[in-house]
């Protein structure tokens, strides 16, 4: 890790008077993992410029290296010497707690004569369902072994391709996994997505990645039909990772909640990350956000008001935006966010519990979360980070506006997606203490 913090720690968030300064948005976690995998599936050398330093990125690099790819870190870049369509067989891969990494690699594992997936996070990734992807791989002819659709999992090919259905009800990552596999199969892949498709934006990011590496693929407007011709090759070269909107949503929200002025650069205006919508949500709530090219300027401290929004397209920003809702006038509701229950924690029930612990009013349904805003938050207690990086972001933002310091347990889990989160906020004027972890 690039930070100098202990391996495990709690964070004590001190109330902030204002936030002021300039930051460059961290590289996108979603694009980093996709670009690294595509680079490994190419034959030859690819330079991925400006990779994220998150635990997910490290998990992908570690697994690709174990599978036989050459990996060299040069400054902020990763130079990958790919294995093409021939990852090593007989390898056990441990993606840690990185669900997307695990699923993407499970799809590609059908190119091998046997790959096993394990995790040292049995109570998190180990409990997350993979059955929809495994069933699709079996229908393509792969051999699969699992613990009732959960890790440990073994996958082995060969498969030729063809037409296959995959459910997108729980996650879009299952379809993305098959999309990475498709171009390297002799017969290609005709994907039919079933169920209520969750998170269209990540699917478009995968299509974007395939295009960046010279792979031909077409999709219907509703993404229910995706066609990928077979016998293709990923083209090596040089790709630049864009800025990360999910993590930046937390910085933008913090800047909106407190007086001051914050400029955040490296956020493309025409970007496929669904969490870009967080900018519009904050504006709708009353935040003063101005865009100049790839830079957003937030003039904070304005009164915010509640909104009701379908959060399906920006699920990874819902936690950060919930901090804005906590101080907005009225009742804010995030609808159609059932997939939040399948993350590192249950981001609906656990969020409701933490908000109530802090004295706020919150309600949940099977697929929604509602928050009643309050002008003040007492703080002065210990909140549970639930081992979830997005929950830690939410609680940190609440602590910045609280009347007294707020302690968050297990704050080291922020490293999963945003290792520099606390350092970036400190650069804007926030103050934190780091204590021995209690959970």
Curated annotation (Swiss-Prot):
It catalyses: 3-phosphoshikimate + phosphoenolpyruvate = 5-O-(1-carboxyvinyl)-3-phosphoshikimate + phosphate. Coiled coil: none annotated. GO terms for molecular function: 3-phosphoshikimate 1-carboxyvinyltransferase activity. Keywords: Amino-acid biosynthesis, Aromatic amino acid biosynthesis, Cytoplasm, Transferase. The active site is at residue 316. 3-phosphoshikimate binds at residues 29, 34, 171-173, 199, 316, 343. CDD domains: EPSP_synthase. Pathway: Metabolic intermediate biosynthesis; chorismate biosynthesis; chorismate from D-erythrose 4-phosphate and phosphoenolpyruvate: step 6/7. One of its GO terms (cellular component) is cytoplasm. Phosphoenolpyruvate binds at residues 29, 99, 128, 173, 347, 390, 416. PROSITE patterns: EPSP_SYNTHASE_1, EPSP_SYNTHASE_2. Monomer. PANTHER family: AROM/DEHYDROQUINATE SYNTHASE, PENTAFUNCTIONAL AROM POLYPEPTIDE. Belongs to the EPSP synthase family. This is 3-phosphoshikimate 1-carboxyvinyltransferase. It comes from Deinococcus radiodurans (strain ATCC 13939 / DSM 20539 / JCM 16871 / CCUG 27074 / LMG 4051 / NBRC 15346 / NCIMB 9279 / VKM B-1422 / R1). The lineage of its organism: Bacteria, Thermotogati, Deinococcota, Deinococci, Deinococcales.
